[in-house]
Each structure stands twice: as structure tokens, then as C-alpha cells.
Amino acid sequence: MREIILDTETTGLDPLRGDRLIEIACVELMNHLPTGNFYHTYVNPERDVPQISTEITGLTRNFLKDHPVFSSVANDFLEFIKDSPLVIHNADFDLKFLNVELTQIQKEPLRNPVVDTLYMARKKFPGSPASLDALCRRFKIDLSNRTKHGALIDCELLSAVYLELRGGRQQGFLLGKDGKSEEGSAELTLASNKELKPSRNFTLSEEEKTKHAAFLKALLK
């Protein structure tokens, strides 16, 4: 099953008040594991970048002005994600920005199935902090390379968090006679009522370690 981890960075909080995308990143998963394929671009917002955004992301107007505008990258972005389910932390935020940008260039809004890991975390750990940082600390995922918020590094971290939220690799993942998952498509919506699987209690296999190493190598190219 192909899924896409997706994250964005923006100039602010509200695209309806003129805030724009400044970075988009996507990481491909197959059966919940990174394949090493990813899409990443910085985006010229065609406006100033507020100081607060620069402090969070490290991205400045001067840096972004030499990068493509959204209309120039939209087709490549859509071609990468295709109709695959999107895995996003706080999905409403990223989808709001993407859909406003797409609408402004006369393209249809995204209709992909969505998995919101914020929803998953709040359901699995009610009352506990559910930010990406908090979940990384909970699952002992290394945050040492995350000095600023960046869409690509956040996708890498979210891919590890998502695997843990699902209970670990292939835990309870059964194939039916037709070769498709018996878990069904309902799990791919925010309204899913299925119980999440318990946390994994075993170490990474050698195959997982190899795949993760290949993924990190691809990100650093």
C-alpha cells in the first residue's frame, strides 16, 4: 500500500489573509515504510517572510526569491502524490494552504484520503502532548538534527512516528485472499472508529535498519 507523508512550511497561519507556502515535502511509504523516494521544494511566496516564520524555519525572503512559485511546482507535486493517501500531522492546516494555492491557479483541491497523525496520537494518548516533538520524545526518536522546522526533516520524523502509532511494522497487517489488506479503507479517514494497535515492544529488524539507512542517505543527497 502506497502512502505519502506530507508536510509544509508557511509564512503564517492563515492563507485567506495572504499567508503563503514556502516549502513542501513528501516522503513515499510502501506498507508504512519509507522507500527512499521523496519530493521536496522551496516555494517563492511572492511576498515578505515575517520574522517569526524565519525564526521557526530559518527561511528568508532573500533565499526564497530565487526559487519557483507554486504554479511552477504544482504539477510535479500532484504527479508525485497521485491519488495516494496522505499522512499529515494536523492535516487541516497543511490541506488548507495547499487547497487555497491550488484554487488560485484554477486547479481542483486535493481529494486524497487523509490520515491525521495528530488525531491518531490524541486518540491513543488522551490528555498527553501530541506535537511532533512530543511524540518523537515519547517514542525515543532522535531529534538532534531538527534545529529548525523544515518540511523534509519533519516528514522523516513523522514517518517514524506514524510507524510507532500504528504499532510497528506489519503488526496485525493481514492479507486477504485477494492480496489486499483486511484492515479496510475506513482507517484512512479522520472519522475512523477502529482501535489503534498497541505500541511495538520489539527492536528493529535488520531489514528495517537497512531501509532506514537508505532513506537517510537519500534525504542527504
Per-range role (PLM):
Residues 1-112, 122-126, 134-148:
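Conserved non-catalytic scaffold segment of RNase H-like nuclease domains
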Residues 130:
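Glycine-rich, pocket-lining loop/helix-strand segments that form or immediately flank
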Residues 183-221:
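Acidic, Ser/Thr-rich low-complexity intrinsically disordered segments
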Residues 85-88, 92, 97, 101-102, ...:
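Acidic, Mg2+-coordinating catalytic module of metal-dependent nucleases/exonucleases
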